[in-house]
Amino acid sequence: EQANPGWVNAAAVPEPTQRPLAHYHRRMLIETLDTARDLGRLKEILGVMVRHGFGDTVRRLGLADRLERAGQVLNWPHAAELARLEPPVQVRLALEELGPTFVKFGQILAGRADLFGPEWIAEFEKLHSHVPALPIDALRPQLREDLGDEPEAVFAWFDTAPLAAASIAQVHRARLHDGTEVIVKIRRPGIADTIEADLRLLVRLAALAEAELPTLKPYRPQQLVREFARSLKRELDLAGECRHAERIAANMAPLGFIAIPKVYWAHTRERVNVQDFIDGVPGSDLEALTPEAGFERTLLAQRGAHAVLKMIVEDGVFHADPHPGNVFYLPGNRIAFIDFGMIGRLSQRRRDELLQLLLGLVEHQPQAVADVLLDWTGDEPGVQIGQLETEIEAFVDQYHGVPLA
């Protein structure tokens, strides 16, 4: 379990009518599931939790008895076998078994080093590469419907072996009739219905967990799940991903060193898109960035920071999933970003506040940093403002005099 930050006093977090509230959310969960016919999926999720050592959490949520009455007998002895594994491994294995929605959730958590220690991040990062691809025959009916013909007829060449696979879609290489090398990104058949059902469950489970497990309240599980649900639903639209890519490409054009794949709209739909194939050094292969290969790591770092700051602070529209698999390094010390299924947006006010926070870091103004953070979090119960300000001052000391970019 992730330790609370020192400035959050869990004991001070109120538990208003906790039991009645938990009972309400539990009842709403079951009633909603019965209506949506999702009870079987709930039993599957909780069964996986039990097998991976989280049976106590199921009991504390008050769902074990209900499942047994519904005919699902939880096999508690299995939990002991997997309980010998480290908690991060248990969670990662559970997410993998639960399928695409939960794999995607874990992939997002891989970028939250502010919430999880390195041992957790290392396990979540494995989720980026542990998604099995579907055979091409499982994709053909959907492809014929979206492209109007077999992919071998639409393209001059189509590779039936996948180049990459992710939780929502998989990618195949192809060649247009004019010789352009492209990738064809294909949404997994049936994935939209699966994700929609899982999100209904997650929303209700988050509400129940927040009511029944007060130590989770500072982490705002309901808000986290709602934001995840909105983002994931948008990511299902592969044409929407391409619109995001074109917008960010236009914003990045003045820099001259950022590459965004071109979109081929004639073959792009909600369930399939076609973009330029990017041939470069993957973001995970830093050892390949040598002077002999024509790369300057310092320059790449500066350009990457410049691009990210421009997206966030100046443009207010940014790539929200920039893990190493979505970044490539190109000749001429250029940087390519791919996969714009997840983007973030910041209002002008938020951008101004973020700039205030960054300037507070480099100009050694801990009070300015604290003011922004407290404004963002609101008047949260249990926050020890004095201790928070002390820790921020110690943190700001590390960056005193460091250039912003």
Task: Label each residue range with its predicted role.
Residues 31-33, 37, 55, 59, ...:
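Helix-rich C-lobe and terminal helical cap/extension of kinase-like folds
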Residues 125-159, 242-254, 291-310:
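A short, contiguous, amphipathic alpha-helix enriched in charged residues
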Residues 321-323:
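Conserved catalytic-loop position in the HRD/HxD motif
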Residues 325-329:
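Hydrophobic residue at the +6 position relative to the catalytic HRD Asp in the kinase catalytic loop
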Residues 170-176:
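Conserved ATP phosphate-binding architecture of protein kinases
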Residues 24-170, 196-221:
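N-terminal accessory/targeting segments that precede structured cores
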Residues 177-234:
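ATP-binding glycine-rich loop module of kinase domains
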Residues 223, 229-243, 247-249, 260-294:
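Conserved structural core of kinase catalytic domains
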